[in-house]
Amino acid sequence: PKGVPITHSSCDFSTKNIAKTLQYSKNDVDLLPLPLSHSFGLGCLHTSLYVGSTLVLQKNSNTTDILNSIKKYNATTLAAIPSTLSKITSNSHTDSLDPLSNLRLIITNSTFFPPETIRKLKSILKTGIVATYYGLTEASRSTFMIFDDEEKIESVGRPSEGVQIKIQNENNDDKIGEIWVKGQNVINNYWKKEYSENKSDEWLKTGDLGRFDDDGFLYILGRVDDLINISGEKVYPQEIERIVKVLSGIDEVVA
């Protein structure tokens, strides 16, 4: 494990970015069924404190409790991991999902958010949006994605304001390669290390594989270390998982 020193300036930068991009305000009631020991939950806490909204901390991610809390506290935003949101939308009793309909925002963070879950959430919300962001503890909230385009439903979005992202590979082209990030959201070095092998000229080497489309939207294809070479062909496990996951009768898949 590596220690990641988080600076005040990087927290301030990321917090202001998410507040501006997703229009958080003092009028929001933010439901947070996430541990504050993780950067996702802690980042949501920072955002609520920054805008002066009401924050409801929930000690578990039980789907029934989440739905009850939304109704009880008139929550306007919900932050949860993809697996929790998938469990909520898989509820066979559609009427029980009514509390979700009044949310203005559902936010998650993940390299992969199942498209079927996104579609179900969007169908339930009246006027609200579903969003995600991509980032690491070392480079928080590097991209943002608001799911309003079916063609981009598997993307993690465009680079956040003030953040640079590039694709680095052996050919020095921008097709598929390791995702490098640069910006105020990126750490200087790991704990007790003057030099980091993960940094190059202020760029953070994330270890994630990705590509940009023609519109500048980023797609995550997996991890550099997970890349499989079959008869000279590069195979990305996450691409296999995405294809198999949409087949009927498949609930979970690991490649």
Annotate each PLM feature.
Residues 158-162, 170-201, 233-235:
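Conserved ATP/PPi-binding loop(s) of AMP-dependent carboxylate-activating enzymes
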Residues 3-5, 32, 54-60, 131:
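Short beta-strand->loop structural element characteristic of the AMP-binding/adenylate-forming
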Residues 110, 135, 157, 208, ...:
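Active-site glycine-centered loops adjacent to acidic/histidine catalytic or metal-binding residues
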Residues 75-80, 89-152, 164:
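Gly/Ser/Thr-rich phosphate-binding loop
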Residues 102, 162, 249-252:
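Glycine-centered tight turns that cap/initiate beta-strands
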Residues 12-29, 37-77, 91:
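Conserved AMP-binding/adenylation subdomain of ANL enzymes
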Residues 1-16:
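Conserved AMP-binding A3 loop
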Residues 78, 183, 189, 209-255:
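AMP-binding/adenylate-forming catalytic core of the ANL superfamily
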